[in-house]
Amino acid sequence: MPCFTVGLNTAKCLSSALGVPLYEFSHQAGHVAAAVYSSGHIELFDREFIAFHVSGGTTEALLVRPDEEKLLNIDIIGRTLDLNAGQAVDRVGVAMGLKFPAGAELEKLALKSQKVFKPKPCVKGTDCCLSGIENKCLDMIKSGEEQCDIALYCLDSVAAALEKMTKNILGKYGNLPLVFAGGVMSNSIIRQRFTKEFGAYFAEPAFSADNAAGTAYLTYLREQKNA
């Protein structure tokens, strides 16, 4: 992406001008490292684990292994085949008249609902399709259903898809530790559900959408290795 190229070139210029080392890490590595660091479980850097990055721009499941050179070796093992989770949440929220990004306001509404939903997620192996969530919620809006119920259905449906993906991934790769990152995973409804069911680790809300802190921590680890 062009924005990453600009950042990389700026870093190269600063490295050259200051005479300091330049360490390159992927966008995903930054998010994963921020999540692991803020969860308080830095021991995961020394073992294999599963990480989910769930946001408006990404909905991916990652197999993460220690790597001598890159520190983290990351392979995508599951993903959305259409909408990202954050896109579905924001589109539904905006359609309801909420401000973009809509995640926080949608959560507040959902917590007021007394309904119990049992969504049927569209999951194919370790991949998911989330566009049906938006379509169903738009139908609910047109039908005049309560906004709090629509909000809860949306978030429950996202959680159900991620839950099914998680079960399929654990069945395929074994009972590995789980780490969740990305703005969508700062949602308290989803966090409580996954903590209870899987014992998953989460980035602190302030770090959920942050990868700069993760990149800084990876740089620290690299410096420690080189010392």
Which stretches of residues belong to each language-model region?
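A short glycine/serine-rich beta->alpha loop
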Residues: 1, 75-80, 122-126, 201-208
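Short beta-strand-loop/turn "lid" adjacent to the catalytic site in phosphate-handling enzymes
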Residues: 1-12, 16
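Active-site nucleophile and cofactor-binding loops and adjacent substrate-binding regions
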Residues: 6, 22-30, 53-54, 80-83, ...
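Conserved phosphate-binding catalytic cores of ATP/NTP-utilizing and phosphoryl-transfer enzymes
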Residues: 25-49, 218
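Glycine-rich phosphate-binding loop plus the immediately following alpha-helix
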Residues: 29, 65-112, 139-144
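Glycine-rich phosphate-binding/hydrolytic loop that grips phosphoryl groups
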Residues: 31-35, 203-227
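Short beta-strand scaffold segments in enzyme catalytic cores
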Residues: 33, 51-53, 59-63
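A contiguous, well-structured pocket-lining segment that forms one wall/lid of small-molecule binding clefts
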Residues: 104-178, 184-195, 199-201, 220-227
